[in-house]
Amino acid sequence: MAHEIRALDAHSIAQVNSLIEQDPVRHCLLAARLEQSKQSRFRPSYPDLLGYFDDGKLKSLLMTGANIVPVNTSLIARQEFAAVLERSGRRSSSIVGPAEEVLDLWSKVSDSWGPAREVRANQPVLAMRSNSLKAIDDDVRYSNHSDLEELIPACIAMFTEEVGISPTVNGGGNAYRNRISELVSGRRSFVKYLGTELVFKAEVGTVGAGVAQIQGVWVKPEFRGRGISVPAMAAVVKLIMADLAPVASLYVNDYNEVAINAYQSVGFEHVDTFATVLFS
């Protein structure tokens, strides 16, 4: 059977949607990418989406750009995609997605792309499809631009703690601040204060295919262990399901047992496993 790898075009999108529908939680980042293109005032184009076609039928896909994301890739598709990535060289900051696919793809490009700064091989993906049965913290609200003075340092602190490097390095400060401001404007940022002190925040980084992917969950260090996270996350889920999407999801490092226990207490269930390869 004849196969080829090529950038997607408008004629391929129906087939992409079929892939997304197989697992919307797994593929919400791809769904968000397509929805973003639909909102553009320009003719949609997809140079960052490479498809693996077999006799004209889309079987697998690779998102390229700031992050490499394999989508429904078979062993042979990963071999073909790896060859493309080796020729182009590394331009991305991470590879992220289903663990088996990410780790196999990384094994095929590591000699030419390596070394990785860190490989996180086991990241449980958790999801909720109904509101939490836990008590909800009514003080959690959407953030607004008056919160940015407190919010941006908290976001930088959380990112640095989670990823191991500040998002402001190499001149990235303005772009990162603009990104947080965009999330605030889009009602995808949530905060809780005690008095005038910001003690909790979370964002929705991606919305697609009816799934909102939560990121950046943070409790101020001196307030951890005080029972803030569970009712606060229950409130975030309620706001998401009321305004953004019927499904809330997130993924977390397997060694962060405290966070996993908190999320499961809220009502999140383990539905998948991701892996992330981080580059400097």
Indicate residue ranges for each PLM-predicted region.
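Conserved donor-binding loop and adjoining core beta-sheet/short helix segment
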Residues: 3-11, 18, 24, 31-90, ...
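Conserved GNAT acetyl-CoA-binding A-motif
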Residues: 89-99, 240-252
